[in-house]
């Protein structure tokens, strides 16, 4: 038995805005190359835009009542897309600190989470070691 969610009415011309966040801050990151390759493989109905978090200061709840302009612009960019793609390396069995910081900015203050009801996917580049 298959359980399907509610169907979304789509016209043949429907397009979706997909924001992507690159977990590595390195300018020559393989994750950046992967993200660009994925955008080229996507159907024309998907419009991709990178949402950079490079300039975000470290998050603190002290900012919740007065967001810096760069953080407000980041939060607004996340809110403006229909879906998100995280293309990230795995550092120490987790996500990079910069990406964690970006997630904190977009999800705060309480009650204003920019990720709410937003489909997302994660592409992870893992550092693997082999014992010889």
Each language-model region and where it sits:
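Short, flexible hinge/linker loops that cap or flank conserved catalytic cores
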Residues: 12-13, 114
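A generic structural motif
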Residues: 43-49
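Residues at the starts of beta-strands that form the adenosine-phosphate
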Residues: 17, 47, 119
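Helix-loop-strand module that forms the ligand-binding subsite of alpha/beta enzymes
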Residues: 67-132
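N-terminal beta1-alpha1 ligand-phosphate binding loop
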Residues: 14-43
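N-terminal beta-loop-helix "entrance" segment that forms/cooperates
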Residues: 50-70
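Short beta-strand/turn micro-motifs composed of small residues
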Residues: 22, 52, 124
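Short, Lys/Arg-enriched N-terminal segments with co-localized hydrophobic residues
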Residues: 2-12
């Amino acid at each position: 038995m298959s359980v399907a969610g509610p169907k979304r009415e789509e016209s043949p011309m429907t397009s979706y805005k997909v924001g992507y966040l690159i977990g590595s801050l390195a300018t020559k990151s393989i994750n950046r190359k992967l993200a660009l390759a994925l955008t080229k493989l996507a159907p024309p109905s998907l419009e991709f835009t990178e949402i950079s978090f490079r300039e975000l200061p470290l998050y603190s709840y002290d900012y919740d009542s007065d967001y810096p302009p760069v953080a407000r612009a980041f939060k607004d960019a996340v809110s403006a897309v229909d879906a998100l793609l995280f293309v990230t390396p795995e550092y120490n069995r987790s996500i990079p600190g910069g990406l964690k910081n970006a997630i904190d900015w977009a999800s705060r203050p309480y009650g204003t989470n920019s990720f709410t009801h937003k489909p997302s996917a994660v592409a992870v580049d893992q550092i693997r070691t082999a014992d010889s």
